[in-house]
């Protein structure tokens, strides 16, 4: 079986790299997109179990990406330091993570959404 695939959309490259490493250590395949355009390209190429996107990206709104991902069957989560400032407060069709986010919280969210990754036997 293949490991479960996660797309992380984060324009802060350092934070995106940190979350990517933490999720990879937990056993997930992870792609990191730094923009909406890059995320859209990833979504056309790969089927993701979970997509986690930052709200404020350099080229748009992360909730748009989550809408695309949801239509493709992925579980979704929005992360931002500005969630309380969003129109409609915290009423979303997906999970929310408020920055700063402890990396283990992201792993826990993915585990709740899709379970633990498949273990490989050697």
Map each language-model feature to its residues.
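Conserved acidic carboxylate
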Residues: 10
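Active-site residues of response regulator receiver
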Residues: 54
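Short amphipathic alpha-helix used as the core "switch/output" element in two-component signaling
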Residues: 63-74, 83
């Amino acid at each position: 079986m293949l490991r479960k695939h996660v797309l992380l959309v984060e324009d802060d490259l350092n934070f995106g790299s940190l979350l990517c490493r933490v999720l990879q250590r937990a056993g997930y395949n992870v792609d990191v997109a730094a923009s909406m355009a890059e995320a859209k390209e990833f979504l056309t190429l790969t089927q993701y179990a979970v997509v986690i996107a930052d709200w404020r990206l350099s080229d748009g709104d992360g909730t748009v990406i989550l809408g695309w991902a949801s239509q493709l069957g992925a579980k979704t989560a929005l992360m931002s330091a500005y969630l309380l400032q969003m129109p409609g407060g915290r009423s979303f069709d997906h999970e929310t993570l408020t920055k700063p986010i402890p990396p283990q919280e992201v792993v826990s969210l993915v585990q709740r959404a899709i379970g633990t990754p498949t273990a490989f036997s050697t």
